[in-house]
Amino acid sequence: MTSAMPSSDIVKNKPSSEHIDIVNEVELKPRYDEANLDKFGAVIEIDPVEKALVKKIDLYMMPILWLMYFLNFLDRNAMINGKLNGLDKDLNMKGTEYNTCVSIFFVGYLVGQVPSNMILNRVKPSWYMSGCMLAWAIVSIFPILAKDYHGMFACRFVLGIVEAPFYPGAIYMISQFYTRKEAATRMAVFYTGNLLASSFAGLIAAGVFAGLDGKHGMQGWKWLFLIQGVVTVGVALLAFFTLPNSPLQTRWLTPDERQLAHNRIAIDTTEKREGTNVWKGLREACFDYRLWLFALMGNLHLSANGFKNFMPSVVQTLGFSTTITLVLTCPPYLLAAFASVAVSWSSGYFNERTWHITISKAVAIVGFIIGTATLNVGARYFAMCLFVGAVYGVNNINLAWTAATVGQTNEKKTVAIAIVNTLGNLSFVYTPYLWPDTDKPRFPMAMWASVGFSAGTVVIAWTLRFILSRDNKKIRAANPDAVNFYVY
């Protein structure tokens, strides 16, 4: 949030009644122009100087984060498309061994997230995030050396550990540079890296399998791991020089822009407090019960997204060839990319969370029900487009909502984001077992479970709406002049 005065004055003017003076984490509260604030205290229209700053951050930070996430998801999902090229048979996998290799990734992924975000708050994010990317790039190539289930199991577990820092770290970086009204849209744009990777992964795999399978004695799925890993190494080296650290420590911002970037986020944070140490941030986050509701909502939401690790196999049940199957995985994710950005933009524009989650989940529920209720090919593919297209905006809204609600200090915010993402991704440890091959083609257990998970997400969202509305009343009672309130 900013005051109604020009943003350039916030930085350049001498102290006055409207001057915002922030030195590190020490903030002197400004006087607000309430005509330019919504009911939660967020600025409705920012001035041209601040708009230019936001565009600059969009141009410099978002593309590299997006590309990193695109490759992050391509690398972890190479195994999923590899199954269509005989990966599981080449490694002599039996029973649920393939499903276990899918899920073990998330065990490593979960173990690393909270410690990683605690470290992130005390090191240079540009170095840390880029270094982690270089590590996962190298590890993602190792599966070409796997000889059996045990080798792939080890590769997937280690890959989960080295990929763990990226997503929660990137979400934290976005929350450091964008206000409540801006963050969800940027997170949605960032998340399209995931969606477009899911969309085009099948096309990339189809091309690799068709052109390189058997070349130089290597199966197509091994070429897929190798090519994607090498590209990721190159992008990791680029990221070392382009990622920012914090608003006050960003090489491609001028000194005035750095101060403005810091000020606008500090003022936009409800019940902002001075920084603390990472252990106190961990304690404060863990004792804020609202965090656990956000975490539960994230877990239920992502539990309904278990299809993402089996989408090629689900589409395959429509009865088409391997190449056509891989091509047909593309449109649902393209639709999801568009819908995710649209829903998140709307959530930010109207500064509203609950109804956006409710409507998205209602559409997804319809898709899950159709998907298991019929064997008609057209209807089932429509259902896939429906539930894939509808669900992805919810995660962006939840994480942006978490950062805005449980982010009174940077240390608390980093831990909160990591905990919500960790417990959310815990779902991917057990949801693979909801999609056994024996349930083809309807996958009734997975589809009906997803209906229940989606309904639970809506219940938690409305519970949070009630709680935050009550918290806002407490803020008004304690300070009748308060203008900054929790969004719901």
Regions found by a protein language model. Name each.
Residues 184-218, 225-232, 417-431:
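Glycine-rich segments within core transmembrane alpha-helices of 12-TM secondary carriers
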